[in-house]
Amino acid sequence: MTVGMVPGASIAGMVFSLVVSFALPIGLFVYAKKKLGAKAAPFFIGCGVFFVMVLMLEAAIHRIVFQLAGEALAGSVILYAVYGGLMAALFEETGRYIAMRFLVKPMDFPNAFMYGAGHGGVEAMLLCGVASISNIAGAVMINSGTMSAQLATLDAEKAADTAAALSALWTTPSLTFFAGGVERIIAVVLHLSLSILV
């Protein structure tokens, strides 16, 4: 399989999503600390709750559910969307409630804002930021010819499989790479709002 070139607009989208994923949480942290007078601890409590509730507990339940009913979920977009939404609501909002009830003190607007920035911010960094770094590294290797040189050292089957896996970087519409950053902005605003409401 021939390795294509990753369009400059796609790389710009990757960089945009990367910058949003890291600059937005850091900017919100600084804003909440300096302008709102929030404590720093709620930010890190938000990060910790995301890690425990989503990356550990929710992920463990997903593994069990997909072993038992993976085919049914994969076969229905609606069922999959409902399942995903319910699981996110259950784990993230339970974690948010526990944090707000027992950990974030005092429970006021500035600290609720700071918690939301931490919870949504670490999610942006880990889900979109890390993927953007990987995409940018792959795009640079492809466009510089390094990837083609690496593929030439593999046997034909492995080279074809690797090129097929990488093909999304040059076949995906460029706007899609911007979408990750836009979606993270929306998600962080949602986390801020939900944290303030709770």
Regions found by a protein language model. Give the residues of each.
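Hydrophobic alpha-helical segments at protein termini of multi-pass membrane proteins
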Residues: 1-198
